[in-house]
């Protein structure tokens, strides 16, 4: 048989001397709903499909996409995609929606056309610059060849001109290596 003292000992909690507080319940974190749920005025579920892509700090992002595509179409589209592609899809939808709002007729296609036209104009400018560069290189090579030819011609003229004046004002032949035969030496000695 059990005594009353044994039963009371078993139900009383043992308090340790380390004085640690009993585990308390963590305070419930209240997160603000995503921008999509705020705009749609609905409760944001824990597994909201739109929450990772439309943060509460950027409501304009969802507003723009919602105006053009509608919330149900955005949700359906995201549910059909794998999670790895959803971020790019949302960014693309927002870009397309912004383009459609700016240009209701052409939308994104108008921006693409404008960019393609810029690319073709820049390619034409690049081709023109490359042609000018080739012409300048050709002119440079012609100029260098002309300078080289002129330099060679001057050297030949200096080599051809074999007479220079000496200190006495007479001309002597520098090309002749035999220094004993000068032109003023008499041919006949008496």
Curated annotation (Swiss-Prot):
Note the superkingdom of the native organism.
Answer: Eukaryota
Where is composition skewed (Polar residues) in this entry? 1-11
- One Pfam entry for this protein is LOB
What ranges does the record give for the region Disordered, renumbered to this chain?
1-27
Which InterPro entries does the record match to this protein? LOB (IPR004883)
Tissues of expression: Expressed in young shoots, roots, stems, leaves and flowers.
Give me the Gene Ontology terms describing cellular component.
Answer: mitochondrion
The record places domain LOB at 32-133
Instruction: State the family named in the UniProt similarity comment for this chain.
Output: Belongs to the LOB domain-containing protein family.
Q: Which PANTHER family match?
A: LOB DOMAIN-CONTAINING PROTEIN 1, LOB DOMAIN-CONTAINING PROTEIN 4-RELATED
**Protein name as it appears in the record:** LOB domain-containing protein 1
**Source organism of this protein record:** Arabidopsis thaliana (Mouse-ear cress)
């Amino acid at each position: 048989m059990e005594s009353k003292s044994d039963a009371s000992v078993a139900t009383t909690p043992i308090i340790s001397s380390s004085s640690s507080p009993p585990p308390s319940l963590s305070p419930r974190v209240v997160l603000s709903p995503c921008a999509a749920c705020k705009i749609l005025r609905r409760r944001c579920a824990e597994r909201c499909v739109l929450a990772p892509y439309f943060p509460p700090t950027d409501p304009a992002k969802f507003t723009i996409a919602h105006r053009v595509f509608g919330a149900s179409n955005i949700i359906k589209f995201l549910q059909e995609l794998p999670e790895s592609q959803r971020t790019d899809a949302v960014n693309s939808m927002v870009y397309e929606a912004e383009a459609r709002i700016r240009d209701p007729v052409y939308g994104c296609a108008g921006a693409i056309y404008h960019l393609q036209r810029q690319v073709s104009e820049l390619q034409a400018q690049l081709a023109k610059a490359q042609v000018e560069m080739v012409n300048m290189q050709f002119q440079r090579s012609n100029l260098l060849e002309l300078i080289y030819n002129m330099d060679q011609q001057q050297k030949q003229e200096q080599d051809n001109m074999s007479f220079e004046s000496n200190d006495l004002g007479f001309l002597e032949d520098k090309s002749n290596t035999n220094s004993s035969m000068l032109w003023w030496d008499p041919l006949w000695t008496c």
